[in-house]
Curated annotation (Swiss-Prot):
The lineage of its organism: Eukaryota, Metazoa, Chordata, Craniata, Vertebrata. Residues 1-9, 71-93, 183-202 are cytoplasmic. One of its GO terms (cellular component) is membrane. It is found in: Membrane. Belongs to the L6 tetraspanin family. Keywords: Glycoprotein, Membrane, Transmembrane, Transmembrane helix. This is Transmembrane 4 L6 family member 1. It comes from Homo sapiens (Human).
Length: 202
């Protein structure tokens, strides 16, 4: 098995997932495509935690690019630097993977909390509050109660959909980074898939 190619595949996957996380988080700021709720601070508190933008997004790009740089055409060096041994590079990628695990874990936790608490919305009494906070997430199974939120329109569906997407994307990122931890340790201990001659030339 070529540990470098595996890392590169994981890296490219993480880039795509990170961009999707950023997009999903940005959409949370604009229910129904409107900007007034963000400017009036009538959004769920967990939207402002930037879990998709920072945790599952920008923070995930660091390990992603590290993983991509591990697999070179000549199979020598570390991220283009020939004076860095391949095994050392694979072991160092474990640290980058741990950063990814922290970022994706943050994304998953915040998304789960956002789903459990529900959106900030205008209720039938004309007050802005977390209508479903006391249900401990049970509102997710009872869609008939979603109409209790009168404004923004369809805010429950909006929040549930996007936080669920962030939860899923963050979970996939977490698994991929965990796989890279194992891949990095095995690659560092067992070496790359290069021939002995290539390893000597390095």
């Amino acid at each position: 098995m070529c540990y470098g190619k595996c890392a590169r595949c994981i890296g490219h996957s993480l880039v795509g997932l990170a961009l999707l996380c950023i997009a999903a988080n940005i959409l949370l700021y604009f229910p129904n495509g409107e900007t007034k709720y963000a400017s009036e601070n009538h959004l769920s508190r967990f939207v402002w935690f930037f879990s998709g933008i920072v945790g599952g997004g920008l923070l995930m790009l660091l390990p992603a690019f590290v993983f991509i740089g591990l697999e070179q055409d000549d199979c020598c060096g570390c991220c283009g630097h020939e004076n860095c041994g391949k095994r050392c590079a694979m072991l160092s990628s474990v640290l980058a993977a741990l950063i990814g695990i922290a970022g994706s874990g943050y994304c998953v936790i915040v998304a789960a909390l956002g789903l459990a608490e529900g959106p900030l919305c205008l209720d039938s009494l004309g007050q802005w509050n977390y209508t479903f906070a006391s249900t401990e997430g049970q509102y997710l199974l009872d869609t008939s109660t979603w109409s209790e939120c009168t404004e923004p329109k369809h805010i429950v569906e909006w929040n549930v959909s996007l936080f669920s997407i962030l939860l899923a994307l963050g979970g996939i990122e977490f698994i991929l980074c965990l796989i890279q931890v194992i891949n990095g340790v095995l690659g560092g201990i067992c070496g790359f898939c290069c021939s002995h001659q290539q390893q000597y030339d390095c």
